[in-house]
Amino acid sequence: MQPLAACLSQVYEQQPQVRVFDCIALTHSGGGDLLTERMVNEIKGKYPNSEYIAYPDATGIKRGTSAMYSDIDLLIKGGFKVKALKTNPRVIDRVNAVNKALDGNIIIDPKCKGLIEDLEKTCNKEGTREIDKSNKALTHFTDAFGYFIYWEFPTIKPTLGSIKR
């Protein structure tokens, strides 16, 4: 069963700018369970009277055939500001952004064991730059965290050009 993962963090002006203070993973309980709605309620219940910003996977805009609302609709309905791209960034760009941010710009609370384990154990398929998702317990937190980091701290790609002489 694929969990829905959320990494809760705050951004500061001074270094380290990102401080991850909680991670939540929820799985379907069955029936007509709306996992995104449960996540919204879980976060707002644990941290009331806060400003909520979500950085979801771009596929969250789509509604299933039986769904009345998309995941992004549910986040907005729950009072979250949503920052989502029209398409997901390339995995390598997300990974590069996270790796750059991990170089002294992030503090992760030790209780965020799922994110820490993901960061330590997620690797590429041998001989490729593609993330190995064969272990179903891994990559959920790194994916969630990666969308946030990519949006707020993107890596800037150099542009190459030619000089006319």
Features from the language model and the residues they span:
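Gly/Thr-rich phosphate-binding beta-strand-loop-beta motif of the actin/hexokinase/Hsp70
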Residues: 1-12
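Short, conserved catalytic/metal-binding motifs centered on acidic residues
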Residues: 6, 54-56, 144
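Active-site-proximal flexible loops/turns
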Residues: 5, 64, 150
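Catalytic-loop motifs flanking and including active-site residues across diverse enzymes
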Residues: 2, 35, 71, 140-144
